[in-house]
């Protein structure tokens, strides 16, 4: 039996990442059972480090996220070193901006253990409107992103717009476009949970559910709130 290792982004209660942490293993198990496949699903957690000072407004704490990712990397390295990772195993990286991709590919190649790397891209320095895009110094992050793209066997994007922007801004050669897949995102169970509210009486309200940070342009939402009822969830 082969293993699908899930390398999750931090499960944050206020964000969809907690729902992904809970739901992706369930969805995978369902699909494995329906297709009568022979896979075991394992989630590799990182250390839930709580720093004294946190990054304001950002999706992740820019210090603590490296503790989380590095402890994930340590765990995976031990699995490779102890012979637990087998040829044909798969790694699902639920946020591709994770340096763990490099050691997984390194160990797979040098230990002669061919595995597949599946990476979900959310944002990065390749997007000039993202916080990484306007805060990181050129040009190192783009070289890193290209490396992780090519290290991954499959790269997933929620929309064609996102996929095309990634390929264009990083100048990915057309011969490597086959690694880029417009997949949508695994929100099935979230949608299922919301169907119970379909018949609930509704009012004309706009919900703005994003992080209250410059890269999300909250000033636009604040300005529009003068014209109609706007609920900014981070200010509730």
Residue ranges and their predicted role:
Residues 9-14, 45-50, 96-100, 123-126, ...:
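Short, solvent-exposed loop/turn segments at secondary-structure junctions
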Residues 183, 188-233:
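Conserved donor-binding/catalytic core segment of Leloir-type glycosyltransferases
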Residues 90-96, 109-131:
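Active-site proximal beta-strand in glycosyltransferases
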Residues 134-155:
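Membrane-proximal helix-turn-helix segments that form the acceptor-binding/catalytic region
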Residues 1-103:
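N-terminal pre-catalytic "stem/leader" segment of glycosyltransferase-like enzymes
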Residues 150-201:
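Donor nucleotide-sugar binding/catalytic pocket of nucleotide-sugar-dependent glycosyltransferases
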Residues 87-89, 114, 151-154, 203, ...:
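Short, well-ordered alpha-helix to beta-strand connector turns
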């Amino acid at each position: 039996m082969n293993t699908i290792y899930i390398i999750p982004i931090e499960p944050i209660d206020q964000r969809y990442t907690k729902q992904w942490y809970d739901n992706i293993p369930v969805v995978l198990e369902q699909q494995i059972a329906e297709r009568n496949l022979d896979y075991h699903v394992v989630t590799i957690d990182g250390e839930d480090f709580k720093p004294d000072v946190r990054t304001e407004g950002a999706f992740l704490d820019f210090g603590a996220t490296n503790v989380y990712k590095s402890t994930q990397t340590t765990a995976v390295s031990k699995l490779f070193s102890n012979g637990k990772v087998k040829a044909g195993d798969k790694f699902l990286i639920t946020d591709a901006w994770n340096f763990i991709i490099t050691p997984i590919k390194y160990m797979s190649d040098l230990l002669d253990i061919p595995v597949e790397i599946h990476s979900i891209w959310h944002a990065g320095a390749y997007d000039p409107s993202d916080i990484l895009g306007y805060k990181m110094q050129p040009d190192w992050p783009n070289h890193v992103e290209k490396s992780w793209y090519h290290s991954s066997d499959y790269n997933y994007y929620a929309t064609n717009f996102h996929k095309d922007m990634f390929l264009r801004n990083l100048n990915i050669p057309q011969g490597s476009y086959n690694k880029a897949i417009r997949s949508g995102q695994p929100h099935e169970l979230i949608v299922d949970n919301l169907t119970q509210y379909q018949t609930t009486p509704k009012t004309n309200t706009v919900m703005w559910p994003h992080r209250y940070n410059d890269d999300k342009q909250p000033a636009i939402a604040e300005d529009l709130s003068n014209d109609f009822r706007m609920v900014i969830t981070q200010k509730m």
